Amino acid sequence: MASFALTEPDAGSDAASLRTTAIKAVDSEGEHYIVNGSKRYITNAPQAGVFTLMARTNPADKGAGGVSAFIVDAKSPGISLGKPDKKMGQRGAHTCDVVFDNVRVPAANLIGGVEGRGFKTAMKVLEKGRIHIAAVCVGVARRMLDDALKYAMERQQFGQKI
């Protein structure tokens, strides 16, 4: 199972405000990135085999252009998970924090092979997800309205229908 790691404690889902960094390095084992930072409310993180991670590869670029997307093996050394979040709804989608502490990610795992395209990648995913959540909310609201109307049509108070 894959998990989408965008949201951060101080940035929410604002990809342009991400603080998680992925700094390129080269050593005897080749090119890689060193990832440091925290992600919050990451859906399916406890079950994930891989993360699609959004991280800042260009710390000088504070905007969306400095964000890149990576595929990261969830079993990589340096990845730790927070306690499972307790939620009122969507309990089937388990969420928790994910912490990246000097996690080594092969350069080949940069999605698209070019730095700075992570914001566009994130938006492609989020646009569909946001439409889905909106549709779920409309469906739930309609059901509640139908149930309330049915109850109001049957309910009596002081011998009269309300």
Please name every model-derived segment.
Residues 20-24:
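A structural signal for short hydrophobic beta-strand segments in well-ordered beta-sheet cores
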Residues 11-13, 40-46, 89-90, 128-133:
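Glycine-rich phosphate/pyrophosphate-binding beta-alpha loops
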Residues 14-18, 29, 47-49, 66, ...:
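A generic structural signal for well-ordered coil/turn residues at beta-strand boundaries
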Residues 25-32, 112-117:
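Intrinsically disordered, low-complexity coil segments
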Residues 8, 26, 57-59, 73-76, ...:
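Non-catalytic surface loops within mature trypsin-like serine protease
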Residues 1-7, 54:
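A short, Trp-centered hydrophobic/proline-enriched beta-strand micro-motif
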